């Protein structure tokens, strides 16, 4: 299970941020949720690893949900009412993290998938033989 997260004080102090951008980076190994303001300054962030999950448990949907809830807890304290969501990566936690953000009460103006797609660039890794 996830360890209880200790409250970390803000370095810059409280500031009112009415609108922001939530970036979800879902890889196969971890899920990172970063909250920025409109200019791109990071307000808060969380990841499955920072929430106390280790090893293969970091790549679970539940770990992604916990990371999203932790990142959003700080921005609600700072008064964020509206947000845009940018989802990147093919990981298993992308849908669950988005669901956790929707439940938080922040109004989402749009959800955009910004996963980089190659136009036949690098050769992909070989298939695993287990």
Swiss-Prot record:
PROSITE patterns: RIBOSOMAL_S11
Subunit structure: Part of the 30S ribosomal subunit.
Record key words, sorted: Chloroplast, Plastid, Ribonucleoprotein, Ribosomal protein, RNA-binding, rRNA-binding
Gene3D superfamilies: Ribosomal protein S11
Pfam families in the cross-refs: Ribosomal_S11 (PF00411)
Family in the record: Belongs to the universal ribosomal protein uS11 family.
GO biological-process terms attached to the record: translation
This protein's GO CC annotations: chloroplast; ribonucleoprotein complex; ribosome
An example Gene Ontology molecular-function term: structural constituent of ribosome
InterPro entries in the cross-refs: Ribosomal_uS11, Ribosomal_uS11_bac-type, Ribosomal_uS11_CS, Ribosomal_uS11_sf
Name of the gene: rps11
Protein name per its UniProtKB record: Small ribosomal subunit protein uS11c
């Amino acid at each position: 299970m996830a360890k209880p997260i200790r409250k970390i004080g803000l370095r810059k102090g409280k500031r009112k941020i009415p609108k922001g951008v939530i970036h979800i980076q879902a890889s196969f190994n971890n899920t990172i949720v970063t909250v920025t303001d409109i200019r791109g300054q990071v307000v808060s962030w969380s990841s499955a690893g920072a929430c106390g999950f280790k090893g293969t448990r970091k790549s679970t949907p539940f770990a992604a949900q916990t990371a999203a809830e932790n990142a959003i807890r700080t921005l609600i304290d700072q008064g964020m009412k509206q947000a845009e969501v940018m989802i990147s990566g093919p990981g298993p936690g992308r849908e669950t993290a988005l669901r956790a953000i929707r439940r938080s009460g922040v109004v989402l103006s749009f959800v955009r998938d910004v996963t980089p797609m190659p136009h036949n660039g690098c050769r992909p890794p070989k298939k695993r033989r287990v």
